[in-house]
Amino acid sequence: LANLEDKSSGSIKFNKDNIILGYMLQKDSLFPWLTILDNCLLGLEIKNIKTEDNISYVNHLLDSYGLAEFKNKYPSSLSGGMRQRVALIRTLAIHPDILLLDEPFSALDAMTRVALADDLYKMIKKEGKTVLMVTHDIAEAVSLSDIVIVLTKRPATLKSIYEIKFEERGTPFENRKKKEFSIYYDKIWRDLDVHI
């Protein structure tokens, strides 16, 4: 999906040609010798699109998501959740059409995971982005997603697709309290054939 390897077969179609992909790894992968602002601008530098407009956009994102006062600090001075927000801003900075998120919260404690899922949801809705996220956390998948795709064990093949519909969709934290949440959670749990 991220074009890191040659595809073996098939194709992926999106509304336009030459889509821009933003890829966020499990770990924040921030460079410790760069300030928060410089880490956020790195993708723009690599793609040679570090314009005044894009720098302004990054500063706007840092301000919007409570990180403006840390932009001249280094990653070591941030919490895990703050570092993940910086990684997400760095990914959004290049104006991707699609965000690929590989277990973006897996390294965080449970409370930070839920709080950051809410932040991610708000950012994605505000920025109007399409997201494809890999997660092993059923609650995270159900509370954040419009569609959940369940894969089989290795080699992974498509097992099931769930269209997640809440009577009234809220933030991931709010969605976890809704009756539909437990229904989807139970269905997906059974689908995964997890035995306790």
Where are these regions (language model features)?
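Conserved ABC ATPase "signature" region
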Residues: 41, 52-70, 122
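Short coil-to-helix segment of the ABC ATPase nucleotide-binding domain corresponding to the Q-loop/switch region
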Residues: 34-41
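Catalytic Walker B motif of ABC-type/P-loop ATPase nucleotide-binding domains
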Residues: 99-102
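Conserved signature/switch motifs of ABC ATPase nucleotide-binding domains
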Residues: 73-76, 94
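Conserved ABC transporter NBD signature motif
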Residues: 9-19
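Helix-to-loop junction immediately C-terminal to a conserved catalytic motif
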Residues: 2
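Helical segment within the ABC ATPase nucleotide-binding domain
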Residues: 113-127
